[in-house]
Amino acid sequence: RGGRNQELVLAALAEAWDSGLDRLVILSGGTDGEDGPTDAAGAEVDQDLWRTARTRKLSPEPFLAINDSYTFFETIGGLLQTGPTHTNVMDLRVALILA
């Protein structure tokens, strides 16, 4: 369960997971408020959510393996839930690596 934006954020997190690159912010969402067959527009992860996942011993890999990014982000509080916006411009993606 999850959509392209949630999956993208989870895949990026998985790439950074073992590298220790935890000072980052990644956000991806659909401007129409929808991402796949879910009630979320996308997902985001930052340092706080990274720590939440680590504390709860949630690794992104098992969720990626079954394409269930929604449950991962629902568990750590990283879903972007805007509701339908009726404005479909494009997907918005932001990635910041903090110094």
Residue ranges and their predicted role:
Residues G2, V9-A99:
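Internal helix-turn-beta structural module
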